Regions:
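Hydrophobic, well-ordered secondary-structure elements that form the walls
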Residues: 1, 41, 94, 133
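Mid-domain catalytic core of redox enzymes
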Residues: 2-87
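Conserved FAD/dinucleotide-binding core of flavoprotein oxidoreductases
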Residues: 7-13, 86-127
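Charged, low-complexity, helix-prone segments enriched in Lys/Glu/Asp/Gln
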Residues: 27, 118-125, 155, 159
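Flavin (FAD/FMN)-binding glycine-rich loop and adjacent Rossmann-like elements that form
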Residues: 65-70, 80, 89, 95-101, ...
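Generic solvent-exposed, charged/amphipathic alpha-helical segments
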Residues: 126-134
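A glycine-rich dinucleotide-binding beta-alpha-beta segment and adjacent secondary-structure elements
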Residues: 135-167
Length: 167
């Protein structure tokens, strides 16, 4: 079990008979999947009912079989389990497919030093996600207390995911 990209995991296991070279080569040459934009939202207490399931929200014109990662067309809403006996949510994650191309221009900048344009970009992506999800959860916008975001750059920086792939 590993929390880093499979190609990186395989490269960490040296001289093992359990991993043959043909397997190593296959894993190393697989195409990467798209990455994810994630908005982790801390909610104001008592405002958004907890739902014990994921909710998928798609634009009416979204092609679910051919994902366009350059536009915010689909968002997964994931509720964190609240305190026992609470009927309201404390935290949700909004996840949307995202292309490496959208964040590639910041790849040479270290974490925390990607500039105001990167911060503005993440705020706009968050707004796009909230705007789409509002059609299903109209009370969401008023319930937002704080937002933390991650992009494919975050996944590359923290879990060695090639091009921020969600693998």
């Amino acid at each position: 079990v590993s929390s880093v990209h499979p190609a990186h995991t395989v490269s960490l296991v040296k001289d093992s008979k359990a991993l043959r070279n043909i397997y190593r080569n296959r894993i190393a040459h697989l195409d990467n999947t798209f990455g994810m934009f994630t908005a982790n939202i801390r909610l104001k207490p008592g405002l958004l009912p907890y739902v014990n399931k994921n909710i998928y929200v798609h634009r009416a014109d979204a092609d679910l079989w051919n994902v366009n990662t350059l536009k915010t067309e689909s968002v997964l809403v994931n509720y964190s389990v609240p305190e026992p006996y609470s009927s309201t949510a404390v935290n949700i994650d909004l996840l949307s497919p995202m292309s490496w191309a959208e964040v590639k221009k910041w790849v040479d900048f270290p974490v925390g030093r990607r500039g105001e344009d990167y911060v503005a970009f993440k705020q706009e992506k968050t707004e796009e996600c909230i705007r789409l999800v509002e059609h299903r959860l109209p009370e969401l916008r008023g319930a937002v207390e704080r937002v933390f975001t991650s992009t494919p750059l975050s996944y590359q920086s923290y879990i060695s995911s090639a091009e921020g792939s969600a693998f």
